[in-house]
Every structure is written in structure tokens, then in C-alpha cells.
Amino acid sequence: MSISIRDGRGALRLVLCALFCLLPAACGGKEPVDDVVAGGTVILEPPSADGGGDDGIRERSLGPSPAAPAAVTPVASPAPRTTARPSAPAVAPVWQDLSRRLAADGISGPRVDALLAGLPATPTQSPMGRKIKALYNRKFFPAPPSDKPQAQYYKGVVTDANARLCRQFITANSKAFRQAEQRYGVLSSIAASLLFVETRLGKVLGDTSENAFYTLASMAVSRTPESISDWLPQLRDHERHMDWIAETMPKRADWAYKETRALVEHMLRDRVPPEHLPGSIYGAVGLCQFMPSNIATYGADGDGDGRVDLFTVPDAVASLSHYLARHGWKAGLSRERQHALLMRYNHSTVYANTIMALADRVAALK
């Protein structure tokens, strides 16, 4: 009996199926617990019912299907970086009351904090100690009257050599002196002589090593005798007059506070750093030696830069001339009236005498 090719194919399929069924047992295998098949394995599938016109054997790869894209977890955007605000400069405890007092007067902010933070941690006792010593001796131990005649001029000031220095200074700063004389009527010889008496034409700007801000701030916070403990032994019999010292010091401290406040306002308004403020023993500043409370009223911008800097010649000359003019100085005044107005600048007869005598010598050098 002949076997057709189609029948042969059917027999072959039966044999193959039997072999596949026997293989797991022969190899000691076990039924897989899931449908996972090693990647790359190829199995044979039976043909579809309709045959599909093929030989009934198809291959299907059981390799891993392409994985579905994993869900992307959104990454949180980093929090916006914040720049830490710089902390306010530390103000030493001893200046805290001064800071609060300035703030109560409307003077506060980072620039004020920076000024106060720049002060040494301990006040200087010198300015208040010196002031109390002078007042104390005048009250309790006044000097006896002297039989010697009072000097007419400051010693060594009214000389031809100094007059020449003043004339040279006027020539070197001719524009500043000319403008001040035209505007305020103060003669250049008078203005230059005043600057010579005050600061030797700007060569001697301070009597102490402390700047004016430190000097005045120290006085402003020195309100009790303990604040000048180093000076008390210099006051004869001070134990008997402690009540007077305790009563006097707050008054001087209040005066110093007003000058300190005026100086802080000047530093803020005219952009003047404290290290640019050498001063007298009680805080006068500049070539013309203004107390700070006079700067806002009488300070003048001589060079037109929009600020008052009494350590520049144009501003110093304009400011001292403005001060005298505001007190009545004008061209053509009598010598007596000029003398009286110079005493308004510094209440001293010898002071006014010296300026006028030196100015006469300067004028003679034209």
C-alpha cells in the first residue's frame, strides 16, 4: 500500500510531538511554573486550522518582547537657590544705647550699623576725662590771677615767614579764594590766616590719634564717673565732689551726642568715611575746624562736586567764609566789626588779634 506524501507528513508530525513530550521527563525536567522561556528559543507551532497554504510548521520566537517604556517619575525641580542676606555687622554692646538713640532720631539702617560696628569695642576715656578735668579745676581750683600781661598774639604765629606761606597757599588755590571772596566778601588774606591759625593750612588736622567720630561717640556714652575711672585720680579731692561729677557728666554727654548725631548725618549725606575725619580733642574737623553741628548749616560746596568735604581747600575756604557772612561779614566792614565776627568763630580775643595781624602781613605781600 502506497503512502502519500501528505500522509507521511502527518506521521512525521506525530513522531515529533511524541519526542517533545518525552524530553522533559528524560532530562529530569519539571513543568515550568510560568511561561517564561529563555531568550532566543524557537518553538514550532501547529498549523492553523485552515492550513494557510503552508506546510503546517511555523516558527515563533519566544525571546523577550520589547519592554514597554517604564513610567518616568518626574523629577522635582530643585528649589530656587536663595542668596543668604548678609547679617548686619556686629555693634559692640557699649554702643548699643547710642545706636538706639540715633534710631529714635530717625538715623538707622545698614550704613549706620556699619559705622557703629567700625568703632573699637571700648570707648576712649580721654575726651570726657579731659573735659571734666578742665571744668573741675576751673570750678574748685581756679588759677590765681596773674600779674603778667596777657599775650596779644599766639606765640610764633605772626611772622613774615608764615605770611609768605599764606600768600603761597592763596596763589596755589587762587580759584577757591577768589570765588569765596566774590561770593561772601571775606578777604583772601583773612581766610588764609584763619586756616593757618586753625590747622597750619591743613598740615595739623588733629590733636589726638582718635578720629572725630570715635572721640564724640565715646563722650556721648560716658555718662557716669565710672566711665572716666582713669582720670578721677587726677582730680584733687574728687571723692568730695563726686555728686558734682555725676551731675555734670550727663550734660556733657548729651552735648556730645548732638555732635555725634550731626557727624553721622554728615558722613551719610556727604559720603565721608570716619577714617577721613581726624579731629580736635573735642571733635572739630576739617581745615577750618568746624564742629559737626555747624556743617549742615554753614558748610559750603566750594568745588561743585555736590558734597561738602572740609578737608578740601575749596570747601573749607567756602565754608569758613559762609560762616562769617552768615554772622554779618561783608565787604567794607570796619576792623572792629571784623574782629568781633572773628570772635564769633572762636570766642578768644587773642585768636581774633592773631588772625587780623597775620592777615595784615599777608595783604602786604601782594
What kind of region is each of these model predictions?
Residues 2-13, 20, 25-279, 283, ...:
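Cell-wall glycan-active module
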